[in-house]
Curated annotation (Swiss-Prot):
Stored PANTHER family: DNA GYRASE INHIBITOR YACG
Binding sites annotated in the UniProt record for Zn(2+): C10, C13, C29, C33
Name by which UniProt lists this protein: DNA gyrase inhibitor YacG
SUPFAM superfamilies documented for this protein: Glucocorticoid receptor-like (DNA-binding domain) (SSF57716)
Any one Gene Ontology molecular-function term assigned to this protein's record: DNA topoisomerase type II (double strand cut, ATP-hydrolyzing) inhibitor activity
Keywords: Metal-binding, Zinc
UniProt region (Disordered), positions on chain: 44-67
Organism: Cronobacter sakazakii (strain ATCC BAA-894) (Enterobacter sakazakii)
GO annotation (BP), single: regulation of DNA-templated transcription
Sequence similarity: Belongs to the DNA gyrase inhibitor YacG family.
NCBIfam families, per database record: PRK00418.1
Designated gene of the protein: yacG
Amino acid sequence: MMSDATIVNCPTCGKEVIWGEKSPFRPFCSKRCQLIDLGEWAAEEKRIPSSGDRSDTDGWSEEENQP
């Protein structure tokens, strides 16, 4: 009997990955691909789009929020 395993593509290299406990780095195919993705986020090569720019004058500054 065949299981209906969900298969996704690795976001880094595109290799097929079975979504399950046998794939500990899911959705990535390997630790290497996982670290490449993390590095891209850390280097700000990837980002979540926003509708506007935030600056320290928008009330997000840590200095303004301290007692």
